[in-house]
Amino acid sequence: MADRKCLALIAHDQKKNDLAAFAKAHEATLSGWKIVATGTTGGRVLDACPGLDVTRLKSGPLGGDQQIGALIATGDVDCLIFFVDPLTAMPHDVDVKALMRLAIVYDIPMALNRATAEQLIDFRRT
């Protein structure tokens, strides 16, 4: 299964548990994907779903968002799920905006909340 699609998972601190729960609810579907995630988010997903193929990159504020952006730019990420916390100020907000911009520029599907992620996963499953 060398040509599996790659999904990037990111969540702000207050949304990490929500993303881990989302991954658990869709574990069977996600098992067909190669997953890249920022460090702490990837750890939470692996705690919830130890059988998933998750590559943990750096923490978002330490460059993980930019690492995922680079993977989008090289065509190595096919889809982005990023659970954003709109109510908390982020010191690395410019990195987040740059990441979203790359997802738009390279026209990959992007979900920024659970409702959209649910639709995206259902669509990608078919």
UniProtKB/Swiss-Prot annotation:
The keyword tRNA processing does not apply. The keyword Lyase applies. GO terms for molecular function: methylglyoxal synthase activity. One of its GO terms (biological process) is methylglyoxal biosynthetic process. Pfam families: MGS. Substrate binds at residues 12, 16, 38-41, 59-60, 92. Its EC number is 4.2.3.3. One of its GO terms (cellular component) is cytosol. It catalyses: dihydroxyacetone phosphate = methylglyoxal + phosphate. Keywords: Lyase. SMART domains: MGS. PROSITE patterns: METHYLGLYOXAL_SYNTH (PS01335), MGS (PS51855). It is an enzyme of class 4 (lyase). Residues 1-126 form the MGS-like domain. The active site is at residue 65. It comes from the Bacteria. Catalyzes the formation of methylglyoxal from dihydroxyacetone phosphate. NCBIfam families: MGSA, PRK05234.1. Belongs to the methylglyoxal synthase family. This is Methylglyoxal synthase. The lineage of its organism: Bacteria, Pseudomonadati, Pseudomonadota, Alphaproteobacteria, Hyphomicrobiales.
